[in-house]
Regions:
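Active-site beta->alpha loop and helix N-cap motifs at the rims of alpha/beta catalytic domains
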Residues: 34, 43, 47-163, 180-184
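Glycine-rich phosphate-binding active-site loops on the catalytic face of alpha/beta enzymes
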Residues: 116, 178, 225-244
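N-terminal small/glycine-rich loop or linker at the start of catalytic domains
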Residues: 1-22, 74-91, 138-149, 193-203
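C-terminal helical cap(s) of enzyme catalytic domains, especially alpha/beta-barrels
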Residues: 238-261
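Conserved, mostly hydrophobic/aromatic
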Residues: 6, 14, 36, 116, ...
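Surface-exposed amphipathic alpha-helices with a cationic face
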Residues: 67-75, 127-137, 189-200, 250, ...
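Catalytic cores of alpha/beta
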Residues: 153-163, 212-228
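Terminal or standalone catalytic/regulatory effector modules within metabolic enzymes
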Residues: 37-38, 43-54, 288-295, 299, ...
Length: 490
C-alpha cells in the first residue's frame, strides 16, 4: 500500500490565508506544539520573513524565541521557512552575505526545512539561495514550482525549470505550489508527470489552495500520480482560501486505498484545540468553497479584491469594479504575466485601478510597478510589453528610482548597528523600524501557555478595565471571588 505524508500549514499559510497572518501568536503555537508533534506530519509550514515581521509589529513577540521554543517542543518534525531566496522582510534584494547570516541564524534557531519560491522562476537565484542554505547548515531545501495560468506557464515551462534547478546538488525535493487554487484535476494529470519525469528520484509534494474548490480534488489526483506529500490545514485552519482540511484529506486518501502517515487520534486532539482557539479568538474557520470560473480569469485573491472595492466605494466609483477586474487581466499580460503571489496581486490590481479611473492607461504608475519593470524583483518571466515599458520608464519618478540606494552591504550594516549585537537582534534591526524592535524587546518573553477556555473572560476583563469609569471589577461564584482594582493590569 502506498504511503502519503501530510505537511501541516495551519500556523503559517492557514493563518495568513484565513486570518491575515495576525490570528495566531506565540502562545497559541506553543500550546499546540506537543499536539502537533504527536501527529507525525512530514513537516510544519511554520514561518516566513513576513510572518516574523508580523510577530514583532503586531504581537511584540520575538520571532527567534518563538522558533527556538517550537523547535525544542517538536524535535522530530521539521519546521519550514518559506522565502523568495535573497530577501528578508524588506522588499529589496539583500546582500548575499546578509542572506548567508539569515540562513545561519534560522538554522541555529530551529528551521529544518527551507522552501525557495522565486516568483519569476529565475534558476540562478534559486540555485544561489540553495547553496547559501546548505553552506550554513544541514536543513533540507525544497524548490517551488509556483503554479499559475497563462500562455507561458505551460507544463514544459515547469519541467524545464525543475530540470535546470535540479542540476544543483543542494536541492533535495520539489513541490508544486498553487497559491491561488487554480490547479484543476485535468491539469494535474499532465503537470505532475511532466515534472516527475525530470527530477529523478527526488520527492515531489503538492500545495494546492482551496480558494475556488479545486484543491482537494487536485491533491487527490496528484496522489495517484506519485507525489510524496500533500499540504493541509487542520480544522478551522483548512479550507476557504487555505489548503484542504486535514481530517477530510485523510478520510479521502484512505477511501482511495492509501496509507496516510498520520496518527489520527492525535490529529483529532489537535483539531479540537484549533477549533477552541478559533472560537475563543473570533477567527472565522475556513469553509469548503464553490467553484468560481471567473476566478480562473482574473486570479485576484479575496483580500486584494476587498481592498480595491473599498477604495472604489470611497471614491464613489463602485460601479467601475467590473472594469477594474477586466483591466487586471490586461495589466498582467502587459507586465509579462507575473504570478499572482505577494506582492504582485496588489501591484497589478492597483495599477488596473489607476488605469480605469485615470485620464489614460499608465498615466499614473506605482513605484512597485516601476521597480518591477526595472527588474528589481527579478527578471520578468516574459518581457514587459515594449510600448507599456516605454510609457512607464519615460517619467521623472522612474529616473529617481533608478538611483535608489541598494540594500547595504553586511559590513556597512554591522558598522551602523554595532558589532556587539546578537545576530538575531541585528537582523531584525537591519530591516525593521527601531521602535518596533525596541517595543518587542521591552515586552519580554512571550507567554508559553494558552487556554482557549479562559481567553473570552480575559478579553472581557481587559475591555472593562480599559473603561475610565471602571474602578473596581468583582467576579463571584460559589467558592470563588476575583476582585480587580484601579491600577491593576491584565
Amino acid at each position: 500500500m502506498t504511503e502519503i505524508r501530510l505537511v501541516d500549514v495551519t500556523m503559517r499559510d492557514g493563518n495568513q490565508s484565513l486570518w491575515g497572518a495576525t490570528g495566531l501568536n506565540t502562545a497559541h503555537m506553543l500550546q499546540a506544539a506537543t499536539l502537533t508533534e504527536a501527529c507525525g506530519f512530514r513537516a510544519i509550514d511554520f514561518t516566513s520573513s513576513s510572518h516574523m515581521a508580523v510577530a514583532v509589529r503586531y504581537f511584540r513577540n520575538n520571532p527567534w524565541e518563538r522558533l527556538r521554543r517550537m523547535a525544542a517542543a517538536m524535535p522530530t518534525t521539521p519546521l519550514q521557512f518559506i522565502t523568495t531566496g535573497l530577501r528578508f522582510i524588506a522588499w529589496q534584494q539583500a546582500d548575499p552575505e546578509f542572506m548567508r547570516l539569515v540562513y545561519r541564524a534560522l538554522q541555529a534557531n530551529g528551521v529544518g526545512r527551507f522552501v525557495l519560491l522565486d516568483p519569476m522562476h529565475e534558476v540562478p537565484a534559486v540555485i544561489e539561495a540553495a547553496r547559501l542554505v546548505k553552506e550554513e547548515g544541514s536543513a533540507e531545501v525544497m524548490a517551488a514550482l509556483t503554479f499559475t495560468l497563462s500562455e507561458i506557464h505551460t507544463d514544459q515551462f515547469y519541467a524545464d525549470f525543475a530540470r535546470a534547478v535540479g542540476q544543483s546538488p543542494d536541492i533535495d525535493l520539489f513541490y508544486i505550489k498553487d497559491p491561488a487554487g487554480l490547479l484543476s484535476v485535468d491539469r494535474a494529470r499532465t503537470l505532475v508527470p511532466a515534472v516527475r519525469a525530470v527530477i529523478g528520484n527526488r520527492p515531489l509534494e503538492i500545495h494546492a489552495h482551496t480558494t475556488v474548490g479545486q484543491g482537494m480534488m487536485a491533491s487527490l489526483e496528484a496522489a495517484k500520480l506519485g507525489i510524496s506529500a500533500i499540504h493541509v490545514g487542520v480544522g478551522p485552519g483548512g479550507d476557504g482560501s487555505s489548503l484542504p482540511e486535514a481530517n477530510r484529506m485523510v478520510a479521502n486518501l484512505e477511501e482511495a486505498g492509501y496509507e496516510v502517515g498520520i496518527d489520527k487520534a492525535a490529529l483529532a486532539r489537535l483539531t479540537t484545540y484549533w477549533q477552541r482557539v478559533a472560537l475563543a479568538e473570533g477567527l472565522p474557520p475556513g469553509k469548503p468553497q464553490n467553484f468560481d470560473a471567473s476566478f480562473l480569469r482574473h486570479q485576484i485573491a479575496g483580500g486584494v479584491m476587498t481592498t480595491i472595492a473599498r477604495q472604489l466605494e470611497e471614491l464613489g466609483l463602485s460601479d467601475r469594479m467590473d472594469a477594474v477586474i477586466a483591466e487586471t487581466g490586461q495589466v498582467r499580460a502587459d507586465l509579462g504575466f507575473p504570478i499572482m503571489v505577494t506582492p504582485f496581486p496588489q501591484m497589478v490590481m492597483t495599477q488596473a485601478l489607476f488605469n480605469v479611473i485615470g485620464e489614460r492607461r499608465y498615466a499614473q504608475v506605482s513605484d512597485q510597478v516601476i521597480r518591477y519593470c526595472m527588474g528589481k524583483f527579478g527578471k520578468p518571466t516574459s518581457p514587459v510589453d515594449a510600448r507599456v515599458l516605454a510609457t512607464i520608464m519615460d517619467r521623472p519618478r522612474a529616473r529617481e528610482l533608478e538611483n535608489e540606494p541598494m540594500f547595504p552591504a553586511l559590513s556597512d550594516l554591522r558598522r551602523q548597528f554595532g558589532t556587539n549585537l546578537p545576530d538575531e537582534e541585528f537582523l531584525l534591526r537591519a530591516v525593521m523600524p527601531a521602535e518596533q524592535v525596541d517595543a518587542m524587546l521591552a515586552a519580554g518573553p512571550s507567554r508559553a501557555t494558552y487556554s482557549p477556555q479562559a481567553a473570552p473572560i480575559l478579553s472581557l476583563l481587559r475591555q472593562l478595565a480599559a473603561k475610565p469609569q471602571a474602578r473596581d471589577i468583582v467576579i463571584e461564584r460559589e467558592g470563588f471571588r476575583l476582585a480587580l482594582h484601579a491600577g491593576a493590569s491584565l
